[in-house]
Amino acid sequence: MPIYTPEEYPAVIERIKAKIAQKNISMGPTISETEIAAFESACNTRLPQAYRLFLLEVGDGWNDPAAEGIASPIHRLAEIERKDLSRPMTLTDGWLWEDEEDEEQLSDESFERKLGNQGVELMDEGCGMTYELITAGPCAGEVWSFSDVGVSPCCERQDFLGWFELWLDSDGDPDYFKDYVYKEDE
């Protein structure tokens, strides 16, 4: 699942709707442009177009208590923490701070410079692992994995629609890192 182009969005949205119906998944209701704009205003950001279309045309979040332990819920916009998302994440590749030997790279300033304000938390997998939609910086629009040891883009790199479609196709247990190869800086 790639990062789709805006021209592909209508077909991808329709394909996702068909898969949701086929799998009998109960999405949260769609939300209005006004609700999206209120979130954006509160967080000082503009949500990526793919995610906005999903909220407007497909639904807002997913939570099936009967599927507990099978798949984590996808947060509804109203549940997402309101924080300033205007500072960009400057990373373009993964960063494992657990392996970092340079103490300067582990300073609060370094974290803030590299991670900005992170992103919109889409899903909490537990054990310190979340999936977040990056809203500012060179990777804006991509979904990244955040954990207690580092951050990395999903591989192949995915926007929200690609990330969600892979989740659908894998019955809630996707391998978002199947092609990821971490490269140490030399």
Predicted feature residues:
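A surface-exposed partner-binding patch
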Residues: M1-D124
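Intrinsically disordered or highly flexible coil/loop and linker segments, enriched in small
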Residues: I25-S26, G128, D173, F177
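Short, low-complexity intrinsically disordered segments
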Residues: D60, D93-W95, E142-W144, L161, ...
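Intrinsic disorder/low-complexity segments enriched in polar/charged and small flexible residues
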Residues: D64, W97-D99, F146, E165, ...
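Short leucine-rich amphipathic alpha-helical surface patches
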Residues: D124-G126, L168
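Segments surrounding the PLD/"HKD" phosphodiesterase catalytic module and close analogs
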Residues: M129-G162
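Long, compositionally biased interface segments
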Residues: C155-E186
